């Protein structure tokens, strides 16, 4: 199979189809707001696969003898015990132990690391200090994400390569017949099940995207847009800045001098409470990633918190009658705050936090309610007092903006993640690939 170049119009990394009518400006790069209807797409990673372009943008490469040293002094992870050809989720903190940024990095070698996400702020600032023998470069790169039981099959069909031996977190270069570019595939994703990324040079983006859409048609591939990108993070149990909370970088005056936007605070939590819009690693159940065998920014605060943790991450499953009542109220003279679909507050919504009560006492903060057309439920991530409530307890979430009309939403405390709680899909980390048809045949 030789893939054909896209001959139609294009915008940045993407082809423009006749139904490509809604676009989203994601950090100055355009992506689809909604490719296929969200209620179809949100079933795709359980039934077939999707393709998503939303994190395409700049790829930053840090290279040189001090590349690992620079990263090590900024992140809570151990960057020295890390095999080349694999990726790792690095977490940057401020001195108070709040998450400044969290980013997936690829390790090419002991002196070269790459990322295609995040804001790149502190690596650039520290590199410019002259204290490190490093070089930082950037280029425009497409990143197309796939997830679902046929994601690997479609990728193999386009690359004409057997990738069944690619393990979780590994990446490797691949060729795409008909396209004279440099590409790589990585086994990673946030839906909680089988998932991959394809990356390559910006110029090939529209061609590669269309090739996968054509190849995946027989498997029912769907185009996921930014409107429903947050669904797999929420149900997959992967907390995400700009979705479930906001970066603590918004409290850094130097960052705000170059930031493209300010933090937008909505929800029933007082907007003056900026702390409720940020998280520590402990508050999103990421403390297991921290390694205290090196000095890093925020270490003292994180160590102190881990000795006496006060909050945890859980899932809240909302009472369906209460959600229906919110929508029914829109047809009266006294409506509650509207809930969009599938994300009740459209992206970017990390600054949205709602008060959570148990027996009338505030016990936590709930992020934006999010709907799944697969499970037919609406859930949210909740950072809750560690003894605030137990799994199975009922709590109240105050839906509505601070000072405005609010609706009490009943919710049941569920574990994080929801897909692991439901246990109806295989985990990407140990997915049985013998059940996946080989697309290179």
Indicate residue ranges for each PLM-predicted region.
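N-terminal non-catalytic cap/leader segment that marks the start of a structured domain
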Residues: 54-55, 139
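Active-site-flanking structural segment that lines cofactor/substrate pockets
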Residues: 34-50, 74, 78-79
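Low-complexity, highly charged intrinsically disordered N-terminal segments
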Residues: 55-66
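A short catalytic or substrate-binding loop motif that flags glycine-/basic-rich loops and adjacent residues
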Residues: 53, 95-98, 347-348
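Conserved, structured C-terminal
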Residues: 1-33, 38-43, 106-111, 116-441
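Internal amphipathic helical hairpin motif
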Residues: 65-102, 150-182
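Short acidic (Asp/Glu) and glycine-rich catalytic loops that position anionic groups and cofactors
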Residues: 48-53, 190-191
């Amino acid at each position: 199979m030789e893939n054909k170049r896209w001959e139609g119009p294009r915008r940045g990394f993407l082809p423009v189809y006749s139904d490509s009518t809604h676009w989203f400006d994601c950090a100055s790069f355009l992506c689809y707001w909604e490719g296929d209807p969200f209620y179809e797409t949100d079933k795709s990673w359980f039934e077939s696969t999707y393709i998503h372009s939303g994190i395409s943008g700049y790829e930053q490469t840090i290279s040189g003898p001090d590349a690992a040293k620079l990263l090590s002094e900024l992140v809570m992870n151990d960057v020295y015990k890390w095999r080349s050809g694999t990726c790792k989720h690095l977490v940057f903190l401020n001195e108070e132990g709040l998450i400044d940024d969290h980013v997936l990095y690829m390790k090419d070698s002991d002196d070269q690391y790459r990322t295609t996400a995040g804001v790149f702020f502190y690596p650039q600032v520290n590199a410019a200090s002259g204290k490190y023998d490093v070089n930082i470069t950037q280029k425009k790169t497409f990143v197309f994400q796939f997830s679902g039981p046929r994601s690997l099959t479609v990728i193999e069909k386009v690359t004409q390569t057997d990738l069944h031996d690619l393990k979780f977190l590994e990446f490797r270069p691949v060729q795409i017949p008909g396209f004279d570019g440099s590409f790589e595939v990585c086994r990673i994703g946030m839906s909680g099940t089988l998932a991959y990324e394809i990356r390559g040079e910006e110029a090939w983006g529209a061609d590669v995207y269309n090739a996968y859409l054509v190849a995946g048609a027989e498997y029912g591939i769907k185009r996921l847009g930014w409107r429903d990108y947050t669904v797999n993070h929420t149900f997959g149990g992967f907390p995400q800045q700009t979705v479930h909370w906001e970066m603590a970088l918004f409290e850094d005056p130097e960052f705000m001098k170059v930031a493209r936007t300010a933090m937008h605070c909505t929800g029933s939590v007082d907007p003056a409470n900026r702390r409720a819009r940020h998280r520590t690693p402990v508050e999103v159940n990421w403390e297991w990633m921290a390694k205290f065998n090196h000095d890093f920014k925020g270490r003292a605060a994180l160590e102190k918190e881990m000795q006496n943790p006060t909050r945890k991450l859980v899932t809240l499953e909302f009472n369906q009658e209460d959600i229906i009542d919110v929508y029914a109220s829109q047809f009266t003279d006294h409506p509650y705050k509207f809930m969009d679909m599938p994300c009740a507050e459209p992206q970017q919504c990390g600054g949205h936090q709602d008060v959570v009560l148990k027996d009338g006492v505030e016990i936590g903060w709930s992020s934006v309610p999010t709907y799944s057309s697969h499970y037919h439920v609406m859930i949210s991530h909740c950072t809750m007092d560690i003894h605030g409530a137990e799994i199975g307890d009922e709590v109240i979430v105050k839906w509505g903006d601070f000072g405005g009309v609010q609706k009490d939403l009943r919710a049941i405390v569920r574990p994080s993640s929801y897909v692991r709680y439901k246990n109806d899909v295989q985990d990407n980390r140990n997915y049985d690939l013998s059940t996946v048809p080989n697309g290179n045949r």
